Each structure stands twice: as structure tokens, then as C-alpha cells.
């Protein structure tokens, strides 16, 4: 039962954080290509690790990450207002590069397939 509740809390916090990032944060450094890939709330609801994927060049990624990290207080306040929990978790922003790694692997597989078809 506890795992089921934790999963529901993770999904609800993920949905709200994504909405907050896209609709409520007005920082010009934040690019539109930021997506929340996962949220992991601890069992005691004290901390929420928010994994974000940021597309763009390195400078845009760094600026977007700084904008998100400077907005964690606002994000936490909004989570507390929107999600009814006993404790509002402290938000920790982490970068998730899994989508980029997946795209790179897909490109490698595509190039191998092209090389194989050219050899035949």
C-alpha cells in the first residue's frame, strides 16, 4: 500500500512541477525546451528530487538550470499550495541526460544500419 501511495505522490508532484515550470515561472533564462522526466519523493516527504531534461546548446542548458535552481523556493511554495501533503518537500533539481543519450544511441544504430545496407 505504501508503494502505491508513493507512486501517486510522485506522479502528482511531477504533474504540478511541470505545470509550474511551463506556466508560472517567468524567468527569461528558462528555455521552452525543459521537460520534467521524473520525480522521486522520499518516504518521509521531506525531499523531492526533480529530474529535468533540457534541450539546446550548453549555454542555454546552463542558463535554464540556473533559472530552475533559483526558482526552487517558488516551486516548493506552489507545490505546497496545489498538493495537499502534511509536509511540503524540499525541491532538489537534477539534470537527466537520458533522452539525449537515447537519441545518440538511436543515431549510432541508424548509421550502422546505413553502413550495413551500403555494404550489400
Swiss-Prot record:
* Pfam families listed in its UniProt record: RBFA (PF02033)
Tagged with keyword Membrane: no
Single GO term (MF): ribosomal small subunit binding
Q: Does Cytoplasm show up as a keyword for this record?
A: yes
Q: Name one GO cellular component term.
A: cytosol
Q: Where in the cell is it found?
A: Cytoplasm
Q: Which UniProt keywords apply?
A: Cytoplasm, Ribosome biogenesis
Q: Name one GO biological process term.
A: maturation of SSU-rRNA
Q: How does it assemble?
A: Monomer. Binds 30S ribosomal subunits, but not 50S ribosomal subunits or 70S ribosomes.
Query: Main role?
Result: One of several proteins that assist in the late maturation steps of the functional core of the 30S ribosomal subunit. Associates with free 30S ribosomal subunits (but not with 30S subunits that are part of 70S ribosomes or polysomes). Required for efficient processing of 16S rRNA. May interact with the 5'-terminal helix region of 16S rRNA.
What's this protein's family per the entry?
Answer: Belongs to the RbfA family.
Please state what the protein is called.
Ribosome-binding factor A
| Source organism of the structure | Clostridium botulinum (strain Loch Maree / Type A3)
Q: Which gene encodes it?
A: rbfA
